[in-house]
Amino acid sequence: MLLSSRIFLNAQPDTPSSMKNLLLKLCTVALVAMSTAAANVQAADLHVMSSGGFTAAYKLLGPRFASATGNTLDTALGPSMGKSPEAIPNRLERGEPADVVIMVGYALDDLIKEGKIIPGSRVELADSRIGMVVREGAAKPDIGSVEALRQALLHAKSIAYSDSASGVYIERELFKRLGIEDQVKPKAKMIPRIPVASVVANGDYEIGFQQVSELLPIKGATYVGKIPESLQSVTRYAAGIPIGAQHPKEAKALIDYLASPEAQPEVKSTGLDSVTMH
């Protein structure tokens, strides 16, 4: 208002050119003010990288966050580790933009140590356990005990497991712990990039193992259950903000929402277990 008053005091209302200059100045002031206001409320375009285990929960919760905040979410999916181009560490190495990464906790810790994630930005999201599927319509073997799981693996004609943390555990530890590594390895295969349940659903493999949250969404496969707790490998999922994130404030808001008590019903509905401490 002070600027406008000065303009009026210096103007000569009786001169057409003075009035024209006055109007131009007022229009300029208004346009600058409008542009500034628009910039302040402009929604952020958040780039999110998410690995498989938390993806189902993220797909439920992400749109709610976007609707509530006006921000948009540009999402890239990929495993937390491995050699595939889609793996989150490889995406970051190539310089793909990211404001949020959601991945296996220990893989996130590796990125923090490498200086790629902001220290202190890690937030715990959920725990994931390993489960098994068969093709829809097939008999469901008993896997409720250690011995039952052992027999199910021995009698299966073919076994599939993922190329993520759960699959690495199955290949390197579970078979050994059950004492059947030599018998089952020739018929077992790690499945890269695609959901394990999908290759069971189409009949390529008789049984498949992956984190429960990654098994449940796939049509054509029947979820049998979790492997016994004494044999479980619990995978912790966490989120962090990469160094160089364009929207760190909005990224933190998204992460806090995913970890909030309000989000837990959706998190649990996807087969994940809530983390009691954040």
Question: What is each model feature region?
Answer:
Residues 102:
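Phosphate-/polyanion-interacting regions in eukaryotic proteins
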